[in-house]
């Protein structure tokens, strides 16, 4: 995964590679602990369910006051309505996979309340109609109208509807659904395996489908058994009501001295009221079970499925409306309800096609828009795949995970490095992409410029680096190595010896600093490649009005914009800042009418920039100089081939002399490099570019100046000569 560092003004390190994976794993572990604390010790949902079951069992055996019965019966009705609403709104049956368990709890709750009300009715029924509570009395008055015969009829109808219609149908649907689901499991499993083998789905999707298939078979199997709860509940309600009526009459007549008619009136009303209070929630739950099992494979909530499918055929609605109008004009039938319903159906039958037409147009427009967006996205993705990052830092798995703790510091220091480059060299380097690359060794990193690897190194995770130079090796255990940025002698030591090294006077460098120093030097060595044509035009657009006129005078009359870019690149290739762009343009304006080659133009520009060059390369106002000896100066001068006009056209040197020069120059330069000295190599103006090409292959960071590039007033300190 890729992460962008160094974006001005701020940078963030984000991604899904190993750097982000370790962080995500920590976040997951932290998040996993939170529900455990809140769910188990604060909300107490699991304890609440256990307490509820215990209360249900307690009601079976202990006498309950009428007030508590009222609360329990009201809760039973509310719980049943909640179950029905959930069954109506779920998108698919598996979304309510806990329904069998809920059904068992609801059935057990109603039976326990039934037993509790039976105990109260038989014990205190002689005290009057309010002996069993206000809920039972209210149902007996409201539903029965004060007549127990009406109550018996209504109760019988509820039992028949619940037992013979809803419950029996739901039971049959559950049986068939369970059988067909179990029979289809092998075929569905084979289909999942086939899709996985063909690559249509990945392993994660296959596991999800298998888990869903397992849940589906378990759900329908449970529903097949759970439907028996509803059926048994209806039978138990009928038997309990009959026992209440006959038992109440006997107890009232024999124990409480009531006459038969009075006992029959009181106990029948209370028993039938009790039966209605328990059978209505049972009917509601049976309806929810029927809705759930009859939903089948239909997607969406029940209202969406019903109204969507009934309203999908406008002709059927219009024909039904016509039939209602005909019934409305028939003699003896009331016209108003039939005309009202017929008009409503006719309105829906006419409005639905228009709405469907508008919806089809909107869908077609949306589909066209999505298709255009998909095509545009595909074109952009192809373009993006062709683009390469200008600067890319690839990290091995272990190294990227190790740097997670310092990602903010990494982003801050990269930002700081980009700002420093902008101030030092006069243009903003591109953003640096950080990539987790599992193909790299775990502790290694690789630096790419324009998609091409230019440097790599393996860090010692858990160790620090001591740059030695000419100093002896520290007394602590470690291993002598070369630091990657400059190739200087260094000593790698475990982090535990940091304090010991500081006591001995050694400066320590951590892995992040080693990496960023190496990255910084690689960027310096490739500044010319990083200055794009776009960057150059941005610099030119920032010029003031007076220098815009100068630019118009020289471009494109004497030098093209690409030629101007070549001059700037040649300067940056030798780490010469282009921040004084106006001075560069003035120098080009002086020489461009006379010469065309960028190599010749840049030598004149360097001479005009001598003050800046020496100022940037001097150390506390002193320019340390390593000269090219007279012998080698003569060799290089004789290797320059000129044409009739005296212009240099070729550099031809004997390979043996070139090899000898490389050996002698390396020895002299390495000596001063190991001492940590900052210096420049000085040669003749004509040979300077060619000597620079040779030295660059040996010491890329060593500046090579000509005699004319040493500005007046600069204090020069000679370090000797290559002779």
From Swiss-Prot:
Q: Where in the cell is it found?
A: Cell membrane
Family the UniProt entry places it in = Belongs to the FHIPEP (flagella/HR/invasion proteins export pore) family.
Q: Which UniProt keywords apply?
A: Bacterial flagellum biogenesis, Bacterial flagellum protein export, Cell membrane, Membrane, Protein transport, Transmembrane, Transmembrane helix, Transport
Q: Where does the sequence pass through the membrane? A: 49-69, 71-91, 96-116, 146-166, 234-254, 272-292, 316-336
The record's annotation in NCBIfam families points to: FlhA
Give the species: Brucella melitensis biotype 1 (strain ATCC 23456 / CCUG 17765 / NCTC 10094 / 16M)
Query: Its topology with respect to the membrane?
Result: Multi-pass membrane protein
**Which portions of the chain have biased composition (kind: Basic and acidic residues)?**
361-381
Role played = Required for formation of the rod structure of the flagellar apparatus. May constitute the export apparatus of flagellin. The flagellum is required to cause a persistent disease in a murine model of infection.
Any one GO biological process: protein secretion
Q: Which InterPro entries match?
A: FHIPEP_1, FHIPEP_3, FHIPEP_4, FlhA, T3SS_FHIPEP
A GO CC annotation given for this chain: plasma membrane
Which residue ranges are recorded for the region named Disordered? 361-382
The record's annotation in PANTHER family points to: FLAGELLAR BIOSYNTHESIS PROTEIN FLHA-RELATED (PTHR30161:SF1), FLAGELLAR EXPORT PROTEIN, MEMBRANE FLHA SUBUNIT-RELATED (PTHR30161)
What's this protein's name? Flagellar biosynthesis protein FlhA
Gene name on record? flhA
Give the domain of life.
Bacteria
